[in-house]
Structure formats: structure tokens, C-alpha cells
């Protein structure tokens, strides 16, 4: 087996407003002696979609052929990859154990493709959002969380307001605790 070009570490996190709404992802990468931060958001998403998106972005950004360790506080993401849930989904035609379509299939397919780009990908579950945790990877996870929350807050919210015989479209942009209508 060829030696990896280098070892890379990725701290990933996702954030969303409720079960559906604006969301963001945050990624902190360390490899080649450098640190790279990436974040982004979507208007109508879930926390789970943002968690998986963050892992996809991490693996797609890191040069091919690496040994990568992904640190995430998402049991959904880490358990799927470490326990091989996706293997059953593939065998069952992307149906879960209830014979229902697997949620977020598009992202799982993207993640599996991104994983194949690397020599080895290791998945590590970390405790998230703990003010007392002294784990060595807490700083990376906390920073990924900050990036995800900031991206979520910067993602505009769109509403359609219908009035009898008149249609008005308004845009509400959320900035921290302040809202502005235009």
C-alpha cells in the first residue's frame, strides 16, 4: 500500500433552525501544516443535512489520497459510517429498515463518493457543545460549531405573504437577534 501524501484532520458541524429552516455547516481542516476554515448555509434544511454536508465538503476539499480523520459530534453521521448503515441501504435499494426511502440519500451518495477519494477515512465521535469538556479535539469542534451557527444566521429567510386581491413578497433577513424587513 502506498504511503499517504499526508495525514489530514477535519472537524465538522452543522446547525439549523428547528426541523426545517435556515441552516449552516462549519468545517475546520488541518493538513500540510495549515488550517483552513469553510462554512456555508442553505435556506430550507435540517441539522442532519448540514452535518453530512460538512463532512462532504471536508473530504472534497482535502487533496486525494490522504489518510483523513473526521471529528464530528453527530451520532447520525458517525454511526452511519462506522457501523456501516449505508451498506444495508445500498443492499436494500436505498430503503431503511422500515422499507422507507433513506433520508438525505443525495448527500449520503455524495459522501460515499468523497470517501473513495482517500486512502483511509476514520470517523471519530466527539462530545459537542460542552463547556466543561477537556477533550483534545474540543477546540476544533467548537470552532466548527461557531462557523456553522454563523453561516446559519447569515442565511436569509424568505416568506411569501398573500393578501386578498394583492400579493406582496417580503424578505426577512436574520442578523443575530435583529431582523430587518425590506
What feature does the model see in each segment?
Residues 124-128, 158-166:
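Short, surface-exposed recognition loops or helix-turn segments adjacent to catalytic cores
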Residues 12-22, 37, 56-140:
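RNase H catalytic domain
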Residues 1-49, 53, 57-66, 81, ...:
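RNase H-like nuclease fold core
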Residues 93-104, 150-163:
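Short, surface-exposed, charge-dense and proline/glycine-enriched linear segments
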Residues 33, 49, 76, 92, ...:
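Charge-rich, low-complexity amphipathic helices
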Amino acid at each position: 500500500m502506498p504511503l499517504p501524501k499526508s495525514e489530514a484532520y477535519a472537524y465538522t458541524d452543522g446547525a439549523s433552525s428547528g426541523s426545517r429552516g435556515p441552516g449552516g455547516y462549519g468545517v475546520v481542516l488541518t493538513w500540510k501544516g495549515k488550517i483552513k476554515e469553510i462554512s456555508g448555509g442553505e435556506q430550507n434544511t435540517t441539522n442532519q443535512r448540514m452535518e453530512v454536508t460538512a463532512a462532504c465538503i471536508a473530504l472534497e476539499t482535502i487533496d486525494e489520497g490522504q489518510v483523513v480523520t473526521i471529528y464530528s459530534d453527530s451520532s447520525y453521521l458517525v454511526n452511519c459510517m462506522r457501523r456501516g448503515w449505508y451498506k444495508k441501504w445500498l443492499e436494500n435499494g436505498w430503503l431503511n429498515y422500515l422499507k422507507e426511502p433513506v433520508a438525505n440519500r443525495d448527500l449520503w451518495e455524495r459522501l460515499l463518493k468523497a470517501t473513495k477519494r482517500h486512502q483511509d477515512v476514520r470517523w471519530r465521535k466527539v462530545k459537542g457543545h460542552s463547556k466543561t469538556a477537556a477533550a483534545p479535539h474540543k477546540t476544533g469542534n467548537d470552532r466548527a460549531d461557531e462557523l456553522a451557527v454563523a453561516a446559519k444566521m447569515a442565511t436569509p429567510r424568505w416568506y411569501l405573504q398573500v393578501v386578498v386581491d394583492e400579493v406582496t413578497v417580503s424578505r426577512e433577513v436574520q442578523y443575530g437577534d435583529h431582523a430587518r424587513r425590506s
